[in-house]
UniProtKB/Swiss-Prot annotation:
Chain's gene name: ndhA
Primary role: NDH shuttles electrons from NAD(P)H:plastoquinone, via FMN and iron-sulfur (Fe-S) centers, to quinones in the photosynthetic chain and possibly in a chloroplast respiratory chain. The immediate electron acceptor for the enzyme in this species is believed to be plastoquinone. Couples the redox reaction to proton translocation, and thus conserves the redox energy in a proton gradient.
Keywords per UniProt: Chloroplast, Membrane, NAD, NADP, Plastid, Plastoquinone, Quinone, Thylakoid, Translocase, Transmembrane, Transmembrane helix
Pfam families: NADHdh (PF00146)
UniProt-listed Enzyme Commission number(s): 7.1.1.-
This protein's name: NAD(P)H-quinone oxidoreductase subunit 1, chloroplastic
Amino acid sequence: MIIDTTEVQAINSFSRSESLKEVYGLVWLLVPIFTPVLGITIGVLVIVWLEREISAGIQQRIGPEYAGPLGILQALADGTKLLFKEDLLPSRGDIRLFSIGPSIAVISILLSYSVIPFGYRLVLADLSIGVFLWIAISSIAPIGLLMSGYGSNNKYSFSGGLRAAAQSISYEIPLTPCVLSISLLSNSSSTVDIVEAQSKYGFGGWNLWRQPIGFIVFLISSLAECERLPFDLPEAEEELVAGYQTEYSGIKSGLFYVASYLNLLVSSLFVTVLYLGGWNLSIPYIFIPELFGINKTGGVFGTTIGIFITLAKAYLFLFIPITTRWTLPRMRMDQLLNLGWKFLLPISLGNLLLTTSSQLLSL
């Protein structure tokens, strides 16, 4: 059977179009996955640069200045160096637990970003239990730290892992009533609904003014969850060498630092969402979208404004934990546990009781 040349060309063009469709489908499948990862990575690099510059200013010294303009690429250079360092394994440790621990710590924190709204309808998963899903996911990270400490077969590492687990439990409990109080005020546990509830009265509608006690407790608890000074007892250098990180080197050691800064950024973003109005500017800016002919809550321009406002609030809030790290001394372990169980927990429960009573009286 003789096939015409035109038919052959048509078949070839059809096969090419089908292969192109498969390639496009694969690209569009990977874009939603790698775009948030790329954004989070850039956010962590910015935090590292900010911390180095702020700490240099506090200590009256010069920060990083050689790697890129103003030293902004120094964190990228350090990460690249860690990639090529030797990955040492403890000879008498549990290799499986030792290797899995850092991954659990990083992945559990990355999952928290799925419920954070960066703009109007710009959230990976708008769940009705968004804030409580974050609390549940964040409680998985200490398991990875405990596995790392136990798998290292080192007394300093194991003590650091135990401290991390005890500290996380002690400050997760007072943090939960603060989040529950916000949910009662907003009549929802969805992060998007909580931001929308704060947009009704502009700047005065922020939960920061309606829940000042809860905000302070949430701030202290989130700093303890991030293991930042004065709450960095799981990795206290003078006592435990480096805590659960003592036996780690190379990329696995870098994963712990990434997890620390990821957790810090997550806490700042949740402070922005729960207490600082989220993506809402809280200042009338209707003339800006009208000037460009774009709706305030829709379109590329409105989405970009929402992302910028959310990140600006989060990074401005980051000055508090960065400054406290370089100004306050470390607490003792008994002081840390007493602060969580005997001070913050009763205050957070009392704040929840007051919030519940006010909501019942307003019905």
